[in-house]
């Protein structure tokens, strides 16, 4: 799909609102542990500054649920952006309050203003029209460079676009790059095409799994979500994470895979622990022998070998979601091994999702991946063939 191009806008000396995705992982001390998403936005910001624009940056961080929560403040983000841009970044104390509106109206060419966390406003996730209008009133132009949230119909992503005509809005360089690359994979993936899907819950990836099945040849399941599938097959999963309300859906996914001839793999062994802790007692067991009150926190070595074999002949790999609780060293081995399998393959490799991107960076194989998407849910929805809400109004109209 062809998007409205930032280079076709007459930005010189104007005020530009850039929706970025600075929802980056933070450590327990409030430090940024992976600034990839921040660095990815710099080219669009610098392009606007080169046009002598006054730049307003907006993002969310975490899920403050419409309230001001200090730990979700964008103070560390503004500090990091300031370092990357090598110029002062002014942080407003609110989103569309008196302070933000005053600073936005007084912003001069070459200056950068960052609004506080968009999700401090309850209307952001509700796609509130009044909030969209207030955000739009701050600038002459709107740029969406937040691929990671473009699957959300939120005020700063979708609602705001209705207050700008096609000559005053466009995709940023990062959004364009993501759409272009993933679009090629959708249209013509080199086969066999495997999807590795992990993470804690089926619920967040249920629809994506259903819609991906007709497009892929193999699906490899890991992470906490595997136990919902195993329970549906009748196995005792102890105290492992399970979504009982989705057991029927899990069954439907497996039935659909069988019908389509898609090979659907589940773990054959797991690393279980007596509690969710780094100092837990752990052991490796078959998926048929998970003890009562123990929980599965990683895939086991037999599963790692099986998945390595399954991936040995694939030509395209989409990986979304870790294989276990990779944040704890004791339960990171499965994810780390799969990361090395993917990195060492000759396949086109696409990594999607913040946790998976964080994982491959932690173990130093990020440069071996063909493409690391800044969006997890967004990349899955795009690969399903959906038009993302944040992209829909940025598509160039024919004729």
From Swiss-Prot:
Pfam families noted in UniProt: PGK
Gene3D superfamilies cross-referenced by the UniProt entry: Phosphoglycerate kinase, N-terminal domain (3.40.50.1260)
UniProt keyword annotations, A-Z: ATP-binding, Cytoplasm, Glycolysis, Kinase, Nucleotide-binding, Transferase
Organism in which the protein naturally occurs: Sulfurimonas denitrificans (strain ATCC 33889 / DSM 1251) (Thiomicrospira denitrificans (strain ATCC 33889 / DSM 1251))
Family annotation (PANTHER family): PHOSPHOGLYCERATE KINASE, PHOSPHOGLYCERATE KINASE 1, CHLOROPLASTIC-RELATED
Coiled coil feature spans: none
Family matches, as InterPro entries: Phosphoglycerate_kinase (IPR001576), Phosphoglycerate_kinase_CS (IPR015911), Phosphoglycerate_kinase_N (IPR015824), Phosphoglycerate_kinase_sf (IPR036043)
Pathway: Carbohydrate degradation; glycolysis; pyruvate from D-glyceraldehyde 3-phosphate: step 2/5
Protein name, UniProt field: Phosphoglycerate kinase
EC number: 2.7.2.3
């Amino acid at each position: 799909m062809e998007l409205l191009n930032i280079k076709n806008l007459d930005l010189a000396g104007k005020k530009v609102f850039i929706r970025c995705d600075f929802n980056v992982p933070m450590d327990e001390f409030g430090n940024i542990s992976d600034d990839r998403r921040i660095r990815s936005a710099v080219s669009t910001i610098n392009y606007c500054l080169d046009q002598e624009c006054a730049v307003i940056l907006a993002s969310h961080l975490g899920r403050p649920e419409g309230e001001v929560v200090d730990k979700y403040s964008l103070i560390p983000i503004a500090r990091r952006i300031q370092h990357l841009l090598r110029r002062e970044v002014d942080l407003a104390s609110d989103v569309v309050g008196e302070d933000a509106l005053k600073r936005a109206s007084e912003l001069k060419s070459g200056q950068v203003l960052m609004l506080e966390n968009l999700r401090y406003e309850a209307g952001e996730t509700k796609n509130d029209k009044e909030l969209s209008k207030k955000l739009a009133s701050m600038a002459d132009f709107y740029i969406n460079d937040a691929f990671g949230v473009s699957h959300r119909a939120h005020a700063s992503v979708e609602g705001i676009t209705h207050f700008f005509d096609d000559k005053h809005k466009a995709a940023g360089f990062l959004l364009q790059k993501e759409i272009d690359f993933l679009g090629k994979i959708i249209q013509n993936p080199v086969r066999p095409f495997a999807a590795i899907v992990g993470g804690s819950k089926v619920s967040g990836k249920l629809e994506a799994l259903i819609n991906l099945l007709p497009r892929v040849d193999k699906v490899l399941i890991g992470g906490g979500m595997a136990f919902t599938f195993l329970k549906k097959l009748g196995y005792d999963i102890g105290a492992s994470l399970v979504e009982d309300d989705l057991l029927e859906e899990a069954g439907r996914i497996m039935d659909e895979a069988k019908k389509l001839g898609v090979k659907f793999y589940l773990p054959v062994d797991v690393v279980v622990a007596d509690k969710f802790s780094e100092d837990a007692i752990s052991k490796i067991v078959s998926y048929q022998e998970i003890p009562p009150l123990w929980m599965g926190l990683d895939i086991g070595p037999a599963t790692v070998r099986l998945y390595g074999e399954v991936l040995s002949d694939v030509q395209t790999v989409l990986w979304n979601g870790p294989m276990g609780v990779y944040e704890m060293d004791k339960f990171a081995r499965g994810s780390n091994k799969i990361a090395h399998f993917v990195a060492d393959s000759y396949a086109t490799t696409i990594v999607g999702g913040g946790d998976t991107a964080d994982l491959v960076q932690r173990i130093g194989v990020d440069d071996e991946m063909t493409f690391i998407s800044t969006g997890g849910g967004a990349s899955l929805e795009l690969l399903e063939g959906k038009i993302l809400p944040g992209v829909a109004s940025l598509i160039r109209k024919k004729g």
